[in-house]
Amino acid sequence: MEPDWIACPECGLQQSCPSCKKPVEKTWVACPVCAQKLDQPPMIGKEKNAAAILTLERIKDYQDRIRLSSRPFYERFADSLPIKNWLFWILVGQLIMLGHYLLARTRGVNIFDDASWFLGIMIGLTMAFIDKSTKNLRKPFPIMFDIVDEPADEFGKWFMNHLSDGLKDRNMLGYGLLFGSINAALGHIYGVWYEDPVLILSITVQWFLIGFAAGLGFKGGIIIIKLTGNFGKKPLIFNSESIDGCGGSSYLGRKILFDAFLYFVVGLMVAGYVLSSPWENAQAPLIKNLIYSWIAFPYVCTLALFFMPINKIHQKLAKFKAKEQNILRARRKSLYLDLAVDSERCRLMEDAERETALKNLTDVVTELRQVSQMSTWPYNSRNLTQFFATLFIPIGIWFLENPSRFLSFIG
């Protein structure tokens, strides 16, 4: 409840008289000052609507402020153009590929023989994914607010500060430059197959750009882990009757799964490119292990993003579930004892009272079954099935279609 609210926007419970605005208690049937009737929870019309609208307006206000304060340089630039962001980044990737193709063609080199044609596509798709993932960072705010036990202003400022600090241009550029430099250096360590200096420069720039994009994505993953981990330390309110089977937290889990999926797609592209490129030093044992490590890195990031951010939320969901189960089991036991044929309580019960007790027992057993089925992770079984199918099916298909290439590379 906010200090200026007359009533709760969720259940309508009053804390102030809708007529004279004097504080009231939930057990009062009427205001002692103006005699206004107070049926709790009341149907208070305008006052209830005003409280709900106030909350929605604050959420919308913070969403606008969060969007304006957490737009890194690449998103601001793409947003300023008259086309969709994802389309812009894909066009950039196509132009990079076209430039490399024209340079290679003038020198009699076919880029479709060495997989370098795929670099431009990778750059465009990765930047489109990162742009989308950055926008997704802001979307969980209303859902987080819905399950956190904090006032709107306090939580809004906390969320905005965490996101804007993490997405500062300096931080994003630092990670981009670091990963870009490492990726370009690794390409030369693996062994450049070109002899023409212009083509060497062209492919080095592309290695740097794809590494730069990967650095932006890596920093985004760190932001997700920190933001969600710190959120999990806050007082949270779960609902055992939520239809998602996760106490009302599955939306947050789906957003994390989506970002983990993007990491995985980037990992597939990296693996496909690395395994298809004719590296000069690929058969050297040390270089081969280095290549394996670089291929595995996006998949490690995918799994880290899948498990690490929601660990605190998982712990709180587990405690909530255990507490609810203990309460319901105690109620079930009490009702069983009351309804036992040889109990004094049962002998003294009227028929109507016994029917009520039986109905209560049925309700408690049903609720206990529902709570027992609740997941202690913000992922339901459908989310998990989709995620792991997405992970393993493409790898299996690629291996079945290219067994000789894979075996020759690892051999």
Please describe what each predicted stretch is.
Residues 164-167, 172-176, 180, 185-322:
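Long, contiguous internal "core" modules enriched in hydrophobic/ aromatic residues
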Residues 143-159, 227-252, 318-345:
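Juxtamembrane inter-helical linkers in multi-pass membrane proteins
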Residues 1-46:
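Cys/His-rich metal-coordination motifs, chiefly Zn-binding "fingers/knuckles"
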Residues 50-56, 259, 272-391, 403:
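Membrane-proximal, solvent-exposed terminal domains/tails of membrane-associated proteins
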Residues 71-93, 155-185, 241-269, 347-393:
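Loop-to-transmembrane boundary segments
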Residues 47-234:
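Transmembrane-helix bundle segments that line or gate the permeation/cavity pathway
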Residues 1, 16-18, 46-54, 102, ...:
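N-terminal soluble segments of membrane proteins
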Residues 398-411:
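Juxtamembrane boundary at the C-terminal end of a transmembrane helix
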